[in-house]
């Protein structure tokens, strides 16, 4: 989970966008400009990153759910892999409007997806006429692509982690409406409005995206392992008392 400024530098986290496309609201996080490209102040990024990771770890330690969101080309694979590693839900293809604000309807689609997967496992596809099987398979693939990453999400997430806030304005608006905190990577060309935990930095480089996503996944795993340690510690005391009682 811990990241150094050197690692951020090597991942290109400090490279912002062209100065003419900047958002003045990101001024506090900008160090300066080089060759008409804004340079992000990594001292501030590191502090904000650590603050965000502490929040994620605390949330995970209280069994909270963090939804990973990264649907642009260079983020998709990384987001999916890191979310799976952390056992967290994710959206890596397209954000469907109402994914949070209309979660009741999404749950119906999740049930449909799970039922279809059960049918495939049971060999139902082989029993269908060719045309019907083709239609079934197409629907299944469409559902897997759009909501496969959230099929184990029983309810609304406790927070969402977003790569590129400008690219996911709808997701952030929905989260804001429902009071769900947003952890967001915000580049120099976007506004940090609506983002509770801002990570100022490059949102285009795959190495930078990997650094953020790995950090969030690690923080979730650390938070969860803290829960296990606490349970074991509590259980260990009980067991000790029982053994003592039995001995007497």
Swiss-Prot record:
Molecular function per GO: structural constituent of ribosome
Positions of transmembrane segments: none
This protein's record includes keyword Ribosomal protein: yes
Record Pfam families: Ribosomal_S2
Record's keyword annotation contains rRNA-binding: no
Gene3D superfamilies on file: Glucose-6-phosphate isomerase like protein, domain 1, Helix hairpin bin
Protein name as it appears in the record: Small ribosomal subunit protein uS2
Organism listed in the record: Dechloromonas aromatica (strain RCB)
């Amino acid at each position: 989970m811990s990241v150094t400024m050197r690692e951020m530098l090597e991942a290109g986290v400090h490279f912002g966008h062209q100065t003419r496309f900047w958002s003045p609201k990101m001024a506090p996080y900008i160090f300066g400009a080089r060759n008409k490209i804004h340079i992000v102040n990594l001292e501030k990024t590191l502090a904000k990153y650590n603050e965000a990771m502490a929040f994620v770890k605390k949330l995970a330690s209280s069994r909270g759910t963090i939804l990973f969101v990264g649907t642009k080309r260079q983020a998709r694979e990384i987001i999916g892999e890191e979310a799976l590693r952390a056992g967290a839900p994710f959206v890596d293809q397209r954000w469907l409007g109402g994914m949070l604000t209309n979660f009741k309807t999404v749950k119906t689609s999740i049930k449909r997806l799970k039922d279809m997967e059960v049918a495939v496992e049971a060999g139902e596809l082989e029993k269908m006429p060719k045309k019907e099987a083709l239609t079934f398979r197409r629907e299944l693939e469409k559902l897997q692509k759009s909501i496969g990453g959230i099929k184990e999400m029983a309810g609304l997430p406790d927070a969402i982690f977003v790569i590129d806030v400008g690219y996911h304005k709808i997701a952030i608006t929905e989260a804001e409406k429902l009071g769900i905190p947003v952890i967001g990577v915000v580049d120099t060309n976007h506004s940090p409005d609506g983002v509770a935990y801002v990570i100022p930095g490059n949102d285009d480089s795959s190495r930078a995206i990997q650094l953020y996503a790995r950090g969030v996944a690690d923080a979730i795993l650390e938070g969860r392992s803290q829960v296990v340690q606490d349970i074991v510690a509590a259980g260990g005391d009980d067991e000790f008392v029982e053994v003592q009682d039995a001995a007497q």
